[in-house]
């Protein structure tokens, strides 16, 4: 997941958009109740609109190519990322992704997950960014809109999603460049087809997609630059096939007052004489609101912080849902993975390549069967750090030297130490670390002593 640093970038874009419209010279004249309803509606609908924009961009192709594929087809990542990779911030170097954007409006899609010798889990998300299911056993699954009525073949497991739009992210564990061919073989065994094709047993060929130059955009930039009418009418349209949850009835009744909801028609006229200026003013004020909400969801692990429950299955925590969407779509629930971060040493000073540090483990992170862990270093720009070894993380697959007492020390330094076995290269300037713990043992985690970072 792209972390909170991306939220800062996103909201900086909001501020630049706002300043371009002369917002400072304008006084906000929108009545307080209307302003609150607009803000609540925006925060509520933001993940839905961003999911749609992301799908539109990711499926904007006639055939499957690197990073894109038509609806209901696999988008298989094929390469291990390195320091040259700049497409997304805080890239994951532990797993290879296989994604699908689904249209479930006509019939279920059958996803056949093969047997593997490694961590390989399929996260299925609905249009509102909630995790509908996590698939981790081999076999055929029917990814199905919840209101679909029909019979499935024997042996096929039904997976209900409450919306027509859905997204799956399959994460397959990778143990370095030499392991890529094994991951490619697993990807080749993954199968996806409509239920009708699965039942007919014919040789299925997916339909050709389409390409539109106008849809070749960065999704977050696209959504943040929408006018109020564009944003809310897109949300209204999407809510017809991707209905709000039953427990959302209170906020749906509230935002219906400004014509936001399934089948509604929003007009910018309610914003007065300068709707775009008033809109930009509102977006600017949302930034401190969401940032202020962030801290209450933080969980501590020693000097590390991570986003805790209900991440990935948000319920009525709409502010949290919007915050995480801005920081990066596809967040796992905590039982699947947690992502602790630190940017300081054990004295609270920012980490910088001007110094060398010892990352000290008393014990490695506790994981359940099939789980794994890693620690990755990122520069101040949130990208991987170039180094002569092309080593970007240390993990449970690293051949680390263990101290006599069973502890492990990792050297964090720009320059290589005499023994490079336990060296994690860092940047010249400031840097930070992300720990990824997949399938964590949450009970043991509460008693676990997280690694400390000590200035050498």
Residue ranges and their predicted role:
Residues 1-8:
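Bacterial N-terminal signal peptides that target proteins for export
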Residues 8-17:
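Bacterial N-terminal signal peptides
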Residues 20-24:
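Sec/Tat signal peptide C-region and signal peptidase I cleavage site
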Residues 25-456:
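A compositional/structural signature for long, glycine/proline-rich flexible linkers
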């Amino acid at each position: 997941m792209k972390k909170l640093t991306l939220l800062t970038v996103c909201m900086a874009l909001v501020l630049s958009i706002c300043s371009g419209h002369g917002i400072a010279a304008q006084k906000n004249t929108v009545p307080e109740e209307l302003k609150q309803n607009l803000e609540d509606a925006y925060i509520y609908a933001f993940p839905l609109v961003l999911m749609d924009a992301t799908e539109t961009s990711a499926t904007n192709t006639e055939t499957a190519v690197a990073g894109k594929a038509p609806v209901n087809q696999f988008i298989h990542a094929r390469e291990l990322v390195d320091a040259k990779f700049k497409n997304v911030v805080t890239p994951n170097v532990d797993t290879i992704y296989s994604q699908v954007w689904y249209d479930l409006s006509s019939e279920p899609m059958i996803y056949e997950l093969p047997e593997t010798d490694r961590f390989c889990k399929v996260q299925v998300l609905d249009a509102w960014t909630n995790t509908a299911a996590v698939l981790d056993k081999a076999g055929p699954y029917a990814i199905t809109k919840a209101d679909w009525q029909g019979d499935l073949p024997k042996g096929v497991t039904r997976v209900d999603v409450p919306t027509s739009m859905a997204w799956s992210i399959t994460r397959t564990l990778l143990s370095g460049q030499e392991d890529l061919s094994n991951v490619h073989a697993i990807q080749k065994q993954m199968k996806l087809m409509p239920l009708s094709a699965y039942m007919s047993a014919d040789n299925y060929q997916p339909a050709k997609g389409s390409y539109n130059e106008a849809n070749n955009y960065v999704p977050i930039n696209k959504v943040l630059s929408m006018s109020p009418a564009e944003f809310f009418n897109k949300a209204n349209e999407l809510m017809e096939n991707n209905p709000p949850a039953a427990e959302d009835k209170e906020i749906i009744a509230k935002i219906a007052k400004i014509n936001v909801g399934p089948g509604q028609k929003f007009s910018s006229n309610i914003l007065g004489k300068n709707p775009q200026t008033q809109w930009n003013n509102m977006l600017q004020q949302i930034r401190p609101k969401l940032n202020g909400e962030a801290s209450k969801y933080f969980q501590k692990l020693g000097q590390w912080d991570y986003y805790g429950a209900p991440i990935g299955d948000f319920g009525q925590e709409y502010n949290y849902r919007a915050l995480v969407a801005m920081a990066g779509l596809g967040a796992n629930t905590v039982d699947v993975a947690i992502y602790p971060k630190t940017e300081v040493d054990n004295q609270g000073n920012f980490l910088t390549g001007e110094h060398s540090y010892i990352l000290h483990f008393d014990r490695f992170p506790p994981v359940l069967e099939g789980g794994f862990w890693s620690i990755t270093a990122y520069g101040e720009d949130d990208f991987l750090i170039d180094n002569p070894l092309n080593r970007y993380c240390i993990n449970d697959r690293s051949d680390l030297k263990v101290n006599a007492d069973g502890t492990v020390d990792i050297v964090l330094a720009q320059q290589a130490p005499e023994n490079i076995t336990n060296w994690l290269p860092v940047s010249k300037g400031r840097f930070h670390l992300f720990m990824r713990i997949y399938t964590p043992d949450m009970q043991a985690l509460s008693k676990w002593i997280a690694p400390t970072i000590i200035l050498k």
